[in-house]
Amino acid sequence: MFGKLCQKVKCRSWFEPARRAFWSDPDRLMAIKATAAIAILAAPMVLSGHPFFGVSLALGALAGALSETDDHPRGRVKSLALKVICFFISTFSVEVLRPYPVLLGVGLALSTVGFLLVGGVGERYRGVTFGAVLVGIYAMIGASISPARYWQPLLLPGGALLYGLFSLFLLYLHPWRPLEEQLARGYRALARYMEIKAELFPSDEATQTRVRGRLALQNVEVVDALDRCKEVLGSYRDSLAGDEPLTPYLRSFMLLQSLHERAASSHERYDLLSRDPESRHLLEGAGQTLLQLSTALRIMAEGLLTGIPYRHPVSLEWTVNVLAGEMEKTRLAADSPLPLLVNNLARSNRSLANMTDERVRGIAPRLERDPRSLWRRFADQLNWNNARLRHAIRLSLCFLVGFAISELLSLRKGEWIVLTCLFVLQPSYSGTRRRLFQRILGTLCGVVGGVSLVQILPTTEGQLLFMLASAYLFFAWLKRNYSVSVVFITTFVLCAFNLVANQGVTLMLPRIADTLVGSGLAFLSVRLLWPDWQFAKLPGLLHEALKKNAAYFGAILEEYRKPSQGDDLAYRIARREAHRADNALVLAWQGMSLEPGRHRQGQDRAFQLTYLNHALLSYISAFGAHRVEQRAAAGEVLPLAEETLAVLRAAESGGMEGRPVEELLAEIRTRAHGTIQSVPRQQLTLLYNIADATGQVLGLSGDLHGTEKQA
């Protein structure tokens, strides 16, 4: 009977589009999963007249969902067991120490430091320990309305356990889903990168500067997605006996990395090329090809999520062929970088087209792993310069002061001050300031909207439905817009307390006050305790970026001299570290915009450095992207490439003046003009761009040090 019903539903015209919409949005899928678990736990209890039990289970499930990690099912089982133990310890400690406020405050502060440092050991532990801190605060909030002291240590971890079992059941039905979601996020992030980059073809100088800044910011998202893919792949590889089941996903990951290197490549300043009518015509075609490639990547991402096999777009193949044909008709200078650009796009197209070709297979690549033991990772955080230790101490002191204010002033539900501190306080000043406004705005909107709707829906059933709708919308918006998600978590809490004690509406004004106090404490703690002003970090970040760029360029030259046989792990690590260092510089520049005025004096200079370093990395990426097809012709170029590497390494140490760079640029120009063959001339053009960008970065870095001293 049930099978026939399912078959009838599948035959409906709306079923397939609905299925695709459902599976192609990971945030929506997560929201439905969490809301279903909360509904299963809360609805029977609330409707049967036991709202405290239902709401406590729901809060436990909420904490469990927020602390869930992307693991192989076996890893998820270990994570769930650890989570339930930590949640029980946290809630049990709160109930035992609740009659002794001084001990509870001290215990809260010390346990917060411990949990955050354990979370720094790895991604799996980070989620569990965050959830343990969160559920402990939930236990503090619910202590006054609990029928007995033993209920919360049972119900809150129990809710997390039941949610975890429900999530595990769904994961066993689709065991590869976390990996597919992370890969899909990576392809979508890269598709957006290509869409932005297409605006450079063609462009003027102002557009070039504006778009390069946006590309640097989008690159942060792409590299973060690649890192998450690597972590999840590592989790799956640790849980499997062999690599064979993982091979399709490893191939997708390697393709994503290769496409990213090609997309990040720059062959010349495109505003200069856009001035030539013939080149402009080809650049317009390159821009259209990039847009077609971004569409293909979105198709790839949707296929990973929905299970629909990837079909290479015919329009992309046609566009690439037309562009190649137009280039053949165009008379270009021997040193024009446009053939490299067109070849780069063609190889990206070929890589995507061969994705499903079973004949195109390589060995299973190794993945970068942290060689340190768990204890060594923990111990490495125990120094005063470690950002995570500083954040843990800030947060624990923030908790301690917030809890003291709550106790000394006998505030109703003053524990919300502590809860606000947890969500607002971030490791950086700029991150905290951003969260502060988002939290306050979201809470105010949630209170106004929530109180209005609770008055319209006075019944238990109506408020239960409103609570579940709030849970769904909270998870659906959590990764998209934090302010919007805060609105719905506020209405969720309002409904929850209204169901338990009919106090949700009366507690909303105190909740606003607690939010303001908690946000203020978070702001003061990050402002006064080890404020990590970005302008002061810029010289160190620039030094690290140049160091990693030099290592990446050195790895490229090693590939030209002696290609890797099968697995190029060392090359991939060098490339990834260069992008991470570039991202750190980009985020520092972005963070400066939220810092106090006197700390923003070097913001324009910081933007120029960020822009130039990202351009330098793009030129290096271009030299690396062509290492396979141009290796044979690189013999006469390698000596100059070695000198360019020496310039990069000297710039890293700060010991190179402008003259040596100028001499190298002059020599590259002379060699390029004296070379007849097109490939070496194109390579020399790339080397010239690398050396020129290095010299510009070095010149600006001297001005940056001067600005820093004045500040």
Q: What function would you assign to each model-found segment?
A:
Residues 1-35, 39, 43, 47, ...:
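Long, hydrophobic alpha-helical segments that serve as membrane-spanning/inserting helices
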Residues 5, 17-30, 47-49, 70-81, ...:
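Short, amphipathic, aromatic/basic-enriched membrane-interface segments that mark the entry/exit
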Residues 15-32, 36-150:
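Helix-loop-helix transmembrane hairpins and adjacent membrane-interface loops
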Residues 28-36, 77-85, 105-110, 149-157, ...:
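Hydrophobic alpha-helical transmembrane segments
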Residues 39-47, 88-96, 113-117, 136-140, ...:
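Alpha-helical transmembrane segments of multipass membrane proteins
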Residues 48-49, 371-472, 491:
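Core alpha-helical transmembrane segments of integral membrane proteins
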Residues 127, 131-152, 494-511, 529:
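Transmembrane helix-loop junctions at the membrane interface of multipass transporters and ion channels
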Residues 452-593, 597-601, 610:
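Generic detector of multi-pass transmembrane helix bundles and their immediately adjacent loops
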